[in-house]
Amino acid sequence: MKYLIAGLGNIGKEYEKTRHNAGFEILDTFAKASNIAFITKRYGDIAEVKYKGRTFILLKPSTYMNLSGNAVNYWLQAEHIPQDKLLVVLDDLALPSGTVRIKGKGSDGGHNGLKHINQILGNSNYARLRFGIGNDFPQGYQMEYVLAKWTKTEYESLIPHFETAVETVKSFALAGIEKTMNTYNRKN
């Protein structure tokens, strides 16, 4: 069974290890732990991970955050993956740093990547894993905050949380959304 795991972020060296690229970091953690490299293909970087009878197509869109729907839709079609096997991994300002939350569907929560995916797919009926990046910034500085790089200390402290997010992704495919929500939404 195939699953499309779309990690949201922005391409380019200047965006590496920024808070807004938490989705990319989580997919990088998954691929690295599986000894799999990403390959540049249409609309993004792709890695295919096989785990316990499941195939995970990891997608890091090259469309920039605000046009993520184009890449997600293309790869759903190209791999013949139904929307209920889609999991979008993204950063979330509303959650404390390192917190992992998964749910089966919902609003875009003001996230431009989700807004575009909803627009292109025509609905919001897909799972999403939100990774908390906190909101420790002065009023009016949200953009600067999300596009800022984590400090070395912050990043190192988040590595176990990236690993928890990867375990949550695996559970989504192995145990289903409900059991995964019950297990991982309570952990942190």
Language model features with spans:
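Hydrophobic alpha-helical segments within soluble ligand-binding/sensing domains
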Residues: 110-113
